[in-house]
Amino acid sequence: AANSIINHNKNKIDKLVWTSNTDGSKIKVQRCSTDADEGREVASTIFEIKMHEQRLNNEFAVLYRTNAQSRAIEDALRKRDISYRVYGGLSFYQRKEIKDLLAYLRLIVNPSDEESLKRIINYPARGIGQSTLDKLIIGAKKNDISLFDTIKNSSKLNLSLNRGVLSKLLDFSNFILSLQIENQKSNAFEIADLVTKKTGLVLELKKDGTPEGVSKVENVEELLNGIHDFVEGQKEISDSEINAILKKM
């Protein structure tokens, strides 16, 4: 089957692909309208074979060409409660660029999420370094308030920070607060799209012109596609929309 497909490539390098296995069943080609449909088709096929033939998960393999393609497949497998392992790379939601965008969304719905806050307070770079963060953490503990509240009130607290840094902290807290307000009237896709544009997250990734850099941009775009698909499936805008998406991921 592989050889017959390769033969259609006019620019191919001559090679013969072979296996010592016996002949298997013919390849089935299934056309899907969207990546979500493709993911559902893959997961449904695996689920049906598992049920009818009592197969184990490790008897199946899914091959895809680009990292971004794994998002729809992973989502569909999770919905079917089919456990999986990604070889030769990371799971879609374990990739740094995906974690960064999701951290912004988590912080919007929960300002007390300190891990997310620490992750993105200086990404993309906004001049808030580790020494500043250390002082903020100490200040939060000393005043028995959250890290975000410490940032929000940093100009009123004795944190030994210069005016330049205090100004950057105020800009950051105001930015997150504005997103929280926007979240009350916009859907999750609009918020996620706004975050990527306002932070310059995609522009930062585009600075890396390598194939890996291009792949990271595609991953972020695919995450936005996934959020858009989720929103389209909802009947009305809800302020818990982002929470629902984060739970799904």
Predicted regions, residues:
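Conserved helicase C-terminal RecA-like lobe
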Residues: S70-I82, R95, L102-M249
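Conserved RecA-like helicase motor-core motifs
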Residues: D81-S91
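Short, flexible active-site loop motifs that bind/organize anionic cofactors or intermediates
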Residues: K28-C32, G88, Y123
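Conserved short loop/turn motifs at secondary-structure junctions
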Residues: F60-R65, L90, N122-Y123, G209-E212
